[in-house]
Amino acid sequence: MYNQGKKWWKVMEGSGFRTLSSIDSERAALLNQRRKAYVLIFMMIMLAQTSYIGAMQGWTYLQDNDVNATGAACSSITRTSGTPIYVDAVNGSDDWEGTWSCPKATLSDALNDSVSDDEIILYEGRYHENVTVDNKDNLMIRAADGARVVFDGTKSITDDLDGVWGTADSDGIQEVTLTEDGWQLFLAYEEQVPARWPNAQFSDETVFNRSYWAEGTLTNSNNAYTQGWLTDAGPETGVHSGLNETINATGLNPVGAIAVMNLGSFRSNSREITDWNSANGTFAYDGTGVGWKTKHHAYFLEGKRELIDADGEWWFDNSNNKLHYKTPSGQNANDLDLRVKVQPFAIGVENSDGVTIQGIDFFGTTVNFNECDGCSFTNSTLEY
Protein backbone atom coordinates (compact mmCIF):
# COMPACT_ATOMS: atom_id res chain seq x y z
CA MET A 1 0.00 0.00 0.00
CA TYR A 2 1.29 3.39 -0.98
CA ASN A 3 -0.09 6.67 0.37
CA GLN A 4 -0.08 9.97 -1.42
CA GLY A 5 2.47 11.56 0.88
CA LYS A 6 5.01 8.86 0.03
CA LYS A 7 5.85 8.24 3.70
CA TRP A 8 4.56 4.72 4.38
CA TRP A 9 4.91 1.43 2.51
CA LYS A 10 3.28 -1.80 3.60
CA VAL A 11 4.35 -5.04 1.93
CA MET A 12 2.45 -8.23 2.55
CA GLU A 13 4.46 -11.27 3.50
CA GLY A 14 2.28 -14.26 4.19
CA SER A 15 -0.30 -13.23 6.80
CA GLY A 16 1.55 -10.25 8.35
CA PHE A 17 3.04 -6.84 7.66
CA ARG A 18 6.64 -5.57 7.97
CA THR A 19 7.54 -1.84 8.49
CA LEU A 20 10.21 -0.28 6.41
CA SER A 21 13.31 1.40 7.91
CA SER A 22 11.67 4.81 8.29
CA ILE A 23 8.84 3.29 10.31
CA ASP A 24 11.27 1.32 12.49
CA SER A 25 13.37 4.35 13.35
CA GLU A 26 10.41 6.53 14.34
CA ARG A 27 8.93 3.79 16.48
CA ALA A 28 12.28 3.25 18.23
CA ALA A 29 12.50 6.96 18.95
CA LEU A 30 9.00 6.93 20.41
CA LEU A 31 9.80 3.99 22.68
CA ASN A 32 13.01 5.69 23.81
CA GLN A 33 11.10 8.83 24.77
CA ARG A 34 8.58 6.73 26.69
CA ARG A 35 11.38 5.04 28.65
CA LYS A 36 12.83 8.44 29.55
CA ALA A 37 9.43 9.62 30.74
CA TYR A 38 9.09 6.58 33.01
CA VAL A 39 12.54 7.19 34.49
CA LEU A 40 11.72 10.86 35.09
CA ILE A 41 8.43 10.00 36.83
CA PHE A 42 10.22 7.48 39.07
CA MET A 43 12.88 10.03 40.02
CA MET A 44 10.23 12.65 40.84
CA ILE A 45 8.45 10.20 43.16
CA MET A 46 11.69 9.35 44.97
CA LEU A 47 12.63 13.02 45.35
CA ALA A 48 9.18 13.83 46.73
CA GLN A 49 9.50 11.08 49.36
CA THR A 50 12.98 12.28 50.35
CA SER A 51 11.76 15.87 50.61
CA TYR A 52 8.80 14.81 52.77
CA ILE A 53 10.99 12.80 55.14
CA GLY A 54 13.49 15.65 55.39
CA ALA A 55 10.75 18.12 56.13
CA MET A 56 9.35 15.93 58.89
CA GLN A 57 12.81 15.68 60.45
CA GLY A 58 13.21 19.40 60.22
CA TRP A 59 10.11 19.97 62.36
CA THR A 60 11.53 17.93 65.23
CA TYR A 61 15.29 18.10 65.65
CA LEU A 62 18.02 18.77 63.13
CA GLN A 63 20.72 16.14 62.93
CA ASP A 64 24.35 17.04 62.24
CA ASN A 65 24.22 15.71 58.70
CA ASP A 66 21.05 17.73 57.97
CA VAL A 67 22.79 20.95 58.88
CA ASN A 68 26.03 19.94 57.16
CA ALA A 69 24.07 19.27 54.01
CA THR A 70 22.46 22.69 54.04
CA GLY A 71 25.08 24.70 55.91
CA ALA A 72 27.09 25.56 52.82
CA ALA A 73 24.02 27.16 51.28
CA CYS A 74 22.75 28.87 54.44
CA SER A 75 24.61 32.09 53.71
CA SER A 76 22.32 32.64 50.74
CA ILE A 77 19.04 31.50 52.35
CA THR A 78 16.75 34.23 53.71
CA ARG A 79 13.77 34.05 56.05
CA THR A 80 10.47 35.52 54.93
CA SER A 81 9.09 38.16 57.29
CA GLY A 82 6.35 36.75 59.51
CA THR A 83 7.58 33.16 59.38
CA PRO A 84 8.95 31.43 62.52
CA ILE A 85 12.52 31.99 63.64
CA TYR A 86 14.26 28.70 64.47
CA VAL A 87 17.06 28.22 67.01
CA ASP A 88 19.35 25.22 67.53
CA ALA A 89 22.01 25.51 70.25
CA VAL A 90 23.87 22.47 68.92
CA ASN A 91 23.80 22.80 65.14
CA GLY A 92 22.78 26.41 64.49
CA SER A 93 24.73 29.57 63.71
CA ASP A 94 23.93 33.20 64.46
CA ASP A 95 25.26 34.01 61.00
CA TRP A 96 22.18 32.30 59.53
CA GLU A 97 18.69 33.66 59.03
CA GLY A 98 16.85 31.29 61.35
CA THR A 99 14.87 29.15 58.90
CA TRP A 100 14.06 25.57 59.87
CA SER A 101 17.01 24.26 57.83
CA CYS A 102 19.37 27.12 58.75
CA PRO A 103 18.58 27.85 62.42
CA LYS A 104 20.25 30.38 64.64
CA ALA A 105 22.40 29.25 67.57
CA THR A 106 21.01 31.50 70.31
CA LEU A 107 17.70 32.84 71.51
CA SER A 108 19.47 36.17 71.98
CA ASP A 109 20.13 36.57 68.26
CA ALA A 110 16.63 35.36 67.40
CA LEU A 111 15.21 38.09 69.65
CA ASN A 112 17.39 40.66 67.92
CA ASP A 113 15.75 39.76 64.61
CA SER A 114 12.21 39.41 65.98
CA VAL A 115 9.32 41.85 66.11
CA SER A 116 5.93 41.80 67.79
CA ASP A 117 3.71 38.82 66.85
CA ASP A 118 6.69 36.68 65.81
CA GLU A 119 7.17 33.04 66.79
CA ILE A 120 10.53 31.68 67.91
CA ILE A 121 10.91 27.89 67.89
CA LEU A 122 13.75 26.21 69.78
CA TYR A 123 15.13 22.82 68.80
CA GLU A 124 16.14 20.26 71.41
CA GLY A 125 19.12 20.95 73.65
CA ARG A 126 20.46 22.80 76.68
CA TYR A 127 20.69 26.57 76.48
CA HIS A 128 22.65 28.89 78.78
CA GLU A 129 21.51 32.44 78.08
CA ASN A 130 20.37 35.60 79.82
CA VAL A 131 18.00 37.50 77.52
CA THR A 132 15.30 40.14 77.79
CA VAL A 133 12.13 40.46 75.72
CA ASP A 134 11.56 44.22 75.59
CA ASN A 135 8.69 46.02 73.86
CA LYS A 136 7.56 43.04 71.77
CA ASP A 137 3.88 42.23 72.15
CA ASN A 138 2.34 38.82 71.43
CA LEU A 139 5.70 37.14 70.97
CA MET A 140 5.71 33.34 71.19
CA ILE A 141 8.81 31.46 72.40
CA ARG A 142 8.31 27.70 72.39
CA ALA A 143 10.00 24.33 72.10
CA ALA A 144 9.76 22.53 68.78
CA ASP A 145 7.16 19.77 68.69
CA GLY A 146 8.47 16.75 70.58
CA ALA A 147 11.71 18.49 71.61
CA ARG A 148 13.03 18.82 75.17
CA VAL A 149 14.45 22.31 75.60
CA VAL A 150 16.18 23.20 78.88
CA PHE A 151 17.54 26.56 79.96
CA ASP A 152 20.40 25.72 82.31
CA GLY A 153 21.53 28.33 84.83
CA THR A 154 24.58 26.31 85.90
CA LYS A 155 28.12 26.04 84.57
CA SER A 156 30.56 23.16 84.74
CA ILE A 157 33.40 23.96 87.12
CA THR A 158 35.98 22.15 85.00
CA ASP A 159 34.64 22.62 81.45
CA ASP A 160 33.04 26.09 81.54
CA LEU A 161 35.01 27.79 84.33
CA ASP A 162 38.31 25.97 83.69
CA GLY A 163 38.57 25.10 87.37
CA VAL A 164 41.14 22.60 88.62
CA TRP A 165 40.50 21.00 92.00
CA GLY A 166 43.42 20.66 94.40
CA THR A 167 44.48 17.49 96.16
CA ALA A 168 42.17 16.30 98.93
CA ASP A 169 43.26 17.01 102.50
CA SER A 170 43.21 14.48 105.34
CA ASP A 171 39.45 14.99 105.72
CA GLY A 172 38.79 14.27 102.03
CA ILE A 173 38.01 17.93 101.24
CA GLN A 174 39.13 19.47 97.92
CA GLU A 175 39.27 23.13 96.93
CA VAL A 176 38.88 25.02 93.66
CA THR A 177 38.93 28.72 92.79
CA LEU A 178 35.83 29.90 90.91
CA THR A 179 36.03 32.65 88.31
CA GLU A 180 32.32 33.41 88.75
CA ASP A 181 30.14 33.65 91.84
CA GLY A 182 28.08 30.53 92.47
CA TRP A 183 25.47 29.88 95.13
CA GLN A 184 24.36 26.28 94.58
CA LEU A 185 26.42 23.19 93.84
CA PHE A 186 25.26 20.18 91.80
CA LEU A 187 26.78 16.77 91.22
CA ALA A 188 25.44 15.29 87.98
CA TYR A 189 22.52 17.75 88.32
CA GLU A 190 21.72 16.59 91.87
CA GLU A 191 21.91 19.36 94.48
CA GLN A 192 24.63 19.08 97.12
CA VAL A 193 24.01 20.41 100.61
CA PRO A 194 25.87 23.37 102.16
CA ALA A 195 27.94 22.23 105.14
CA ARG A 196 25.74 22.34 108.23
CA TRP A 197 25.15 21.10 111.76
CA PRO A 198 23.13 19.02 112.49
CA ASN A 199 23.84 17.11 109.28
CA ALA A 200 21.03 16.62 106.75
CA GLN A 201 20.83 15.76 103.06
CA PHE A 202 18.68 16.54 100.04
CA SER A 203 19.08 12.97 98.80
CA ASP A 204 17.02 11.52 101.67
CA GLU A 205 14.96 14.70 102.25
CA THR A 206 16.19 15.03 105.84
CA VAL A 207 16.77 18.75 105.16
CA PHE A 208 12.97 19.08 105.24
CA ASN A 209 12.60 17.13 108.50
CA ARG A 210 12.19 19.29 111.62
CA SER A 211 13.95 16.60 113.67
CA TYR A 212 17.18 17.50 111.85
CA TRP A 213 17.12 21.00 113.33
CA ALA A 214 18.56 21.62 116.78
CA GLU A 215 16.25 23.24 119.33
CA GLY A 216 16.38 25.99 121.92
CA THR A 217 15.30 25.57 125.54
CA LEU A 218 12.82 28.46 125.60
CA THR A 219 9.14 27.68 126.23
CA ASN A 220 6.08 29.81 126.87
CA SER A 221 6.69 29.66 130.60
CA ASN A 222 10.39 29.41 131.43
CA ASN A 223 11.91 32.57 129.87
CA ALA A 224 15.19 30.66 129.46
CA TYR A 225 16.79 33.40 127.35
CA THR A 226 15.93 36.69 125.68
CA GLN A 227 15.96 37.95 122.11
CA GLY A 228 19.55 37.95 120.81
CA TRP A 229 20.46 34.74 122.64
CA LEU A 230 19.73 31.04 122.18
CA THR A 231 20.52 28.13 124.47
CA ASP A 232 20.87 24.72 122.84
CA ALA A 233 18.51 22.04 124.17
CA GLY A 234 21.03 19.22 123.78
CA PRO A 235 20.96 15.93 121.84
CA GLU A 236 18.05 14.67 119.74
CA THR A 237 17.90 10.94 120.36
CA GLY A 238 18.87 8.99 117.26
CA VAL A 239 19.41 12.14 115.18
CA HIS A 240 22.21 14.38 116.48
CA SER A 241 24.28 15.25 119.51
CA GLY A 242 23.94 18.58 121.27
CA LEU A 243 25.92 21.64 120.20
CA ASN A 244 28.07 21.61 123.33
CA GLU A 245 28.78 17.91 122.88
CA THR A 246 29.71 18.46 119.23
CA ILE A 247 32.04 21.35 120.10
CA ASN A 248 33.74 19.32 122.81
CA ALA A 249 34.21 16.37 120.46
CA THR A 250 35.40 18.25 117.36
CA GLY A 251 36.84 21.55 118.57
CA LEU A 252 34.35 23.49 116.44
CA ASN A 253 34.21 27.20 117.18
CA PRO A 254 30.65 28.37 116.45
CA VAL A 255 31.56 32.07 116.45
CA GLY A 256 31.37 33.33 112.88
CA ALA A 257 29.00 30.57 111.76
CA ILE A 258 25.56 31.45 110.41
CA ALA A 259 22.63 30.38 112.58
CA VAL A 260 19.47 29.79 110.55
CA MET A 261 16.79 30.18 113.21
CA ASN A 262 13.06 29.65 113.33
CA LEU A 263 12.08 31.93 116.21
CA GLY A 264 8.62 33.07 115.21
CA SER A 265 6.53 30.12 114.03
CA PHE A 266 6.40 30.57 110.24
CA ARG A 267 9.26 33.07 110.08
CA SER A 268 12.95 32.19 109.91
CA ASN A 269 16.01 34.43 110.07
CA SER A 270 19.73 33.95 109.54
CA ARG A 271 22.25 35.70 111.78
CA GLU A 272 25.98 35.42 112.39
CA ILE A 273 26.95 34.00 115.78
CA THR A 274 28.88 36.70 117.64
CA ASP A 275 29.60 35.00 120.97
CA TRP A 276 29.54 31.56 122.58
CA ASN A 277 29.16 30.58 126.25
CA SER A 278 30.35 27.01 126.67
CA ALA A 279 29.28 26.94 130.31
CA ASN A 280 25.58 26.82 129.45
CA GLY A 281 25.60 26.15 125.68
CA THR A 282 24.32 29.60 124.70
CA PHE A 283 25.27 31.67 121.65
CA ALA A 284 24.65 35.33 120.85
CA TYR A 285 23.47 37.00 117.64
CA ASP A 286 22.09 40.37 116.55
CA GLY A 287 18.39 40.13 117.38
CA THR A 288 17.37 43.28 115.51
CA GLY A 289 14.44 42.62 113.21
CA VAL A 290 14.01 38.91 113.90
CA GLY A 291 10.52 37.47 114.22
CA TRP A 292 10.44 36.52 117.89
CA LYS A 293 7.93 34.43 119.80
CA THR A 294 8.43 32.61 123.08
CA LYS A 295 7.84 29.10 121.72
CA HIS A 296 9.22 26.36 119.50
CA HIS A 297 12.68 27.73 118.71
CA ALA A 298 14.74 25.65 116.27
CA TYR A 299 17.96 26.28 114.36
CA PHE A 300 20.90 24.86 112.43
CA LEU A 301 24.38 26.19 111.70
CA GLU A 302 26.16 26.70 108.37
CA GLY A 303 28.76 28.98 106.80
CA LYS A 304 32.04 27.56 108.14
CA ARG A 305 34.53 25.13 106.63
CA GLU A 306 34.76 23.25 109.92
CA LEU A 307 31.16 22.12 109.42
CA ILE A 308 32.15 19.94 106.44
CA ASP A 309 32.10 16.42 107.83
CA ALA A 310 29.83 14.44 105.48
CA ASP A 311 30.05 13.40 101.83
CA GLY A 312 28.47 15.94 99.50
CA GLU A 313 28.84 18.93 101.85
CA TRP A 314 30.41 22.15 100.58
CA TRP A 315 31.33 25.67 101.68
CA PHE A 316 32.20 28.75 99.61
CA ASP A 317 34.75 31.24 100.92
CA ASN A 318 33.65 34.66 99.68
CA SER A 319 36.97 36.23 100.65
CA ASN A 320 38.94 34.36 97.99
CA ASN A 321 36.26 32.71 95.78
CA LYS A 322 37.31 29.22 96.84
CA LEU A 323 34.84 26.37 96.90
CA HIS A 324 35.48 23.57 99.41
CA TYR A 325 33.82 20.17 98.83
CA LYS A 326 33.91 16.69 100.32
CA THR A 327 33.39 14.26 97.47
CA PRO A 328 31.34 11.06 97.78
CA SER A 329 33.44 8.02 98.69
CA GLY A 330 36.73 9.90 98.31
CA GLN A 331 36.42 10.37 94.54
CA ASN A 332 38.51 12.97 92.71
CA ALA A 333 36.42 16.09 92.13
CA ASN A 334 38.22 16.67 88.80
CA ASP A 335 36.58 13.49 87.49
CA LEU A 336 33.04 14.46 88.56
CA ASP A 337 30.34 16.46 86.79
CA LEU A 338 30.24 19.32 89.30
CA ARG A 339 28.33 22.47 88.39
CA VAL A 340 27.50 25.75 90.12
CA LYS A 341 24.45 27.96 89.72
CA VAL A 342 25.57 31.31 88.34
CA GLN A 343 22.38 33.12 87.25
CA PRO A 344 18.96 33.89 88.76
CA PHE A 345 17.07 34.38 85.47
CA ALA A 346 17.42 33.09 81.91
CA ILE A 347 14.56 35.02 80.28
CA GLY A 348 13.20 38.38 81.33
CA VAL A 349 10.09 40.06 79.92
CA GLU A 350 9.37 43.77 80.29
CA ASN A 351 7.25 46.41 78.57
CA SER A 352 5.61 43.64 76.53
CA ASP A 353 2.08 42.21 76.61
CA GLY A 354 0.76 38.84 75.48
CA VAL A 355 4.16 37.11 75.53
CA THR A 356 3.98 33.30 75.71
CA ILE A 357 6.75 30.95 76.83
CA GLN A 358 5.68 27.38 76.16
CA GLY A 359 7.09 23.88 76.60
CA ILE A 360 10.50 25.02 77.90
CA ASP A 361 12.09 23.60 81.06
CA PHE A 362 14.40 25.48 83.44
CA PHE A 363 17.19 24.11 85.64
CA GLY A 364 18.96 26.33 88.15
CA THR A 365 17.31 29.42 86.67
CA THR A 366 13.86 30.78 85.84
CA VAL A 367 11.92 33.60 84.13
CA ASN A 368 11.17 37.14 85.29
CA PHE A 369 8.02 38.95 84.09
CA ASN A 370 7.65 42.72 84.60
CA GLU A 371 4.96 44.99 83.15
CA CYS A 372 3.53 42.12 81.13
CA ASP A 373 -0.26 41.93 80.78
CA GLY A 374 -1.74 38.75 79.35
CA CYS A 375 1.57 36.90 79.43
CA SER A 376 1.65 33.14 79.94
CA PHE A 377 4.20 30.55 81.01
CA THR A 378 2.93 27.03 80.28
CA ASN A 379 3.89 23.36 80.06
CA SER A 380 7.22 23.88 81.80
CA THR A 381 9.20 22.23 84.59
CA LEU A 382 11.34 24.32 86.94
CA GLU A 383 14.05 22.75 89.10
CA TYR A 384 16.19 24.66 91.60
Regions found by a protein language model. Name each.
Residues 1-69:
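Secretory targeting signatures
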Residues 55, 59-89:
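Boundary/junction segments of secreted and surface-exposed precursor proteins
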Residues 75, 79-384:
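Extracellular polysaccharide-degrading/modifying enzymes targeting complex plant/algal/animal polysaccharides
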